[in-house]
Amino acid sequence: TMAFVRILATLVRDKNIGSRIVPIVPDEARTFGMEGMFRQLGIYSSVGQLYQPEDADALAAYRESKDGQVIEAGINEAGAFAAWMAAGTSYSNHLHTLIPFYIYYSMFGFQRVGDLAWAAGDLQTRGFLLGGTAGRTTLNGEGLQHQDGHSHALAATIPNCISYDPAYGYELAVIIQRGLEHMFVEKEPVYYYITVMNEAYEQPAMPVGAEQGIVKGMYCIQSDEGTTGARIRLLASGTLLREALAAAVILLSLIHISEPTRQLQ
């Protein structure tokens, strides 16, 4: 999630496309670490800010303005998704291309407003959906209603929804770059769904030449080519990649089975 926010912050500062980026969030902006955008970009309000927020003295205060760029919809996933669809179809409805990024708790996307996801496909919406806190590994304190591990099964039923489940920040950067090219340069009528999680773990450098495999959906993270004997392949994505890497150590040290670990997207 942190890697996504950094990528988004870079995109909104780009002189060519920054003004076309539409960050959309229901009520979870602080969970995702997006509160810095409140002051930087402002939250869109047709009437401006008519009150003084409680955090007015804070560095990342809640700031609404008529020219704000962030759409903060509150606890209204259907409304936020509808705003994403409106921005994602502006290229055809208004002949003005916008690039919407809608991030939300991933359990409250396809499972809650799946009909809108289908409608987005029918309308040839272009944009990015980010299922935050995915993987069933964090946010237990807020209950099982946030524990998403199956939204990709639902996303796979929509033909023009391209979904990825990355584990590392460099994968996310490659996927978003490819999505921008796919939708806004090649002008394909698709949208991207990407799950991101909020666990804190080491972010390695990208293996040389991994970009093509990341885009296609699978690439090799590590391989014990020099070993002999029984060999297996471990395939994993998202939050489970680190578990697969840990399993590889156990297999090699205790059972003497070597494996090339492959990262699924």
Please place each PLM-identified region on the residue numbering.
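Thiamine diphosphate
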Residues: T1-P204, E211-G213
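Glycine-rich nucleotide phosphate-binding loop and flanking beta-alpha elements
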Residues: R30, L241, L264
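A broad detector of short, well-ordered amphipathic alpha-helices
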Residues: A82, Q177, R242-A246, E259
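Short, well-ordered secondary-structure micro-motifs
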Residues: P204-P207, L245
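Long hydrophobic segments that form regular secondary structure
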Residues: G213-L254
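Single conserved hydrophobic/aromatic residue that forms the stacking wall/gate
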Residues: I255-Q265
